Amino acid sequence: MNKKIILSISLVGFLSLANAQTEKQIPEVTIASKSLQEINKSGKNVTLLTQKDLEKYKGQTLSDVLERITNFQITGSFNNNSEPKTLRVRGGDNNVVILIDGIPMKDVTTIKNNVMDIRLLSLENIESIEILNGASSVLYGSNAGTAVIDIKTKKNSYKKIDAAFGMRGGSYGTFAQNADISGKLGIFNYHISGFNEKSDGLSSAEGDDSFDKDGFEKQALNAKAGISLKNFNFNLNGGWNHHLFKYDNGAFSDGENRGNDKQAYLGGNANFLYRNGQLTLNTRFSNNKRIGETFIGNSYQEQYSYEGKDFFAELFNRYDFNKNIQLTAGLQYENQKMNENENSSFDAFANALFTYRFVHLEAGTRLTNHSKFGNQWTYSANPYLYQELGSSFIKLGYSFATAFISPTLYQSFGSLPYVLPNPDLKPETSLSHEINISFGKKDRSLLISAAVFNRKEQDVFGYYTDPFTYLGIYKNISENTTKGFEVDFNYQLTSKIGFGGNFSFVEKENHAAMKRQPKQRVNSYIEILPFKGSRVLISHLFVGGRADAYYDSLTYSTREVILSDFNLFNASISQQINPKLSFYLNLNNILNKEYTDVVGYTTKNRNFTFGMNYRF
């Protein structure tokens, strides 16, 4: 019976959260070409979550939202909130680029891929999310092997002063508060936001009642200010994020450990519009500090400490030769430091878009000169057909692209005495083919899309341990081929009923590289607006079986396991009392399903969040 119910819900459309909208204005995105473009006309299928979409997920985490995106697997998403979250997109392993307001945000203290820790980001400060699947190194450089995620922070108000406040509480002794104030004074605009969250949590490691809870707390403060003129705008932005959390020794192993992560950043953005194009300057400096401590005797004592700094600067120009030819070209510089180690890179890139009636061709190339491994070329070609049929559209495209992943400072320089340096470590490279098709309404009230892809990876990073000295080192040890397909469906049946979802499939020739990655995933949802100001959202998630492994401290060996598939049902209810006040209730894992996300670590049982928002 349960299988019939699950199948019925899944067949309501191969279901996806992505982009259910009823606005008549066609939304525009910047992620596909680095400049504003109607989302339907981009060469690849782009996922857009507007503020209206994110309203459905109040009180949840960013990983909760990304879990609903096609072919996204956020490992650790269903464990204790303080546990690490790994983004696995289309079978990749954290090889994504995260942008904040169009500018890369990186953490150079990480072991691999320098991906920002998404635990530091609160949904309360996010206006919208744009996602571009597939290799995108031509526009975004290293790490853009499987996806680019652009997180747009809250917009400034057009009033002189506007303020909002929110608070929530729920299971595991979790309480959070957020506030923001923004406004516009003539040509000047500003926005300040703050966030605080504390939780008793649950035991990170799976075990008996003697395992203590691993709580956490997070604080964030963000600010931006700028000026807006007719043909020029400039803004400064900065922020501080803090995450203090307890964690256990490992799978099935309790412990008294504490992590203390801090991130600070300062950046700027300037845009100059002229008759035939736009000139853009992006800069950002970020500093990350990570401290790990273990409780020994009667106090916490430091076990490790890393500090990393990243400086990024980019200047690019979009020029429209005419309505049929557009060229975007630019320069990029990045410098990374961690403790005493450092590397830098200088990039030049160009990307052109040619249009003739319904035929389009996007092609580009990038040259990266890296202080560690020299020159690296990447290139892409994306021919596609786009035709509007009244209020509808249809698009069919093919893309061919290369991408690369630079070794991190940790992988290149090691961490003595445990990890040896490898000065000969080369970048990991990939070659991707993709065919995509989409059909729907231009206002996105109906959207059907599908994609099939094949990605060949070479010089994949691997960690090798010497069996005699037990010292480790990172090497280029393997190659692999990943293939899969994905389907999205979203339909706004009436002004009060919408449904949709997604199905994704991915597999690798080297099955050992599929650790913690399912072959199949299904998301589905139905949204109902029963009364004025009311919203009811019911969602379903299916995650297929996965291979996993853990270190057994009793046998001093690694044990491999196969994790069972699982289904989760969630519900969200919200009520707008008046234009200023609203309430919401989230119910997760309604059926109280027992399941495993990561072997040896506790997953969340039935839980809830209740909250309110007030706008002054």
Residue spans for each PLM region:
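Extracytoplasmic beta-strand/coil segments of soluble accessory domains associated
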Residues: 38, 63, 67-104
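Short acidic/polar hinge/loop motifs at secondary-structure boundaries
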Residues: 86, 104-133
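A beta-strand signature from Gram-negative outer-membrane beta-barrel systems
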Residues: 120-164
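Outer-membrane beta-barrel signature, preferentially recognizing the C-terminal barrel domain
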Residues: 253-269, 273, 399-457, 465-492, ...
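Surface-exposed extracellular loop regions of Gram-negative outer-membrane beta-barrel proteins
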Residues: 289, 371-377, 383-434, 452-477, ...
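Gram-negative outer-membrane beta-barrel transporters
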Residues: 323, 355, 454-456, 475-551, ...
